[in-house]
Amino acid sequence: MLDPVAESLGYEIVRLRLMGGTEQRRLQIMAEHPLLEDGSGGDMNVEDCAKLSRAVSEVLDAADPIAGEYTLEVSSPGIDRPLTRLKDFDDYAGLEARIELDRVAEGRKRFKGELAGVEDDQVGLNIEGEDDVTVYFPFAWVIDAKLVMTDALMERGAKQRAARLESDNEDLSESEED
């Protein structure tokens, strides 16, 4: 219901989560600009969050899919973002992540290592501390995954923001010419 709304505005929903008990419930929507081949995309600024929040509010108010009161919260996933979609494991290949599975694989449920991309529906991870060991497990087994804050991640985030600013400035220049 909300993916088409986000996509029509140029965003992708990363995670949708209803939190809280019967009181003070919060519908959290994490969204971002799609990652592009030139490295731009990714994070959202405050204006983007407000724009998506207004559009989503209209749809939710009309459809009323959630009984009772709740607070709508729209945010960017942040630099040490959760990995919630299969494509995230490909998009962020080469970066360090923590992954938790719903079952034991390779003798454990929790892993930390460098993302090795995706093969079919299998998530690849180069295991930390073990020479040249890459494990693959079904995406369906992943219950929690998140990028780890590293210098490489910070550098990638800075490049994405720079590419986004450049793109925004080009858009602004084009609109001023019109």
Swiss-Prot record:
Any one annotated GO CC term: cytosol
Q: Per UniProt, which keywords does this protein have?
A: Cytoplasm, Ribosome biogenesis
Biological process terms from the Gene Ontology for this record are:
ribosomal small subunit assembly; translation
Q: Name one Pfam family in it.
A: DUF150_C
Q: Which cysteines are joined by disulfide bonds?
A: none
Entry superkingdom: Bacteria
Localization recorded for this chain is: Cytoplasm
Record's InterPro entries? Ribosome_maturation_RimP, RimP_C, RimP_C_sf, RimP_N, RimP_N_sf
Q: What does this protein do?
A: Required for maturation of 30S ribosomal subunits.
Belongs to which family?
A: Belongs to the RimP family.
Concerning PANTHER family, the annotation shows:
RIBOSOME MATURATION FACTOR RIMP
Q: Which HAMAP family match?
A: RimP (MF_01077)
Q: What is this protein called?
A: Ribosome maturation factor RimP
Please report the organism this UniProt entry assigns to the protein.
Caulobacter vibrioides (strain ATCC 19089 / CIP 103742 / CB 15) (Caulobacter crescentus)
- The protein's gene is named rimP
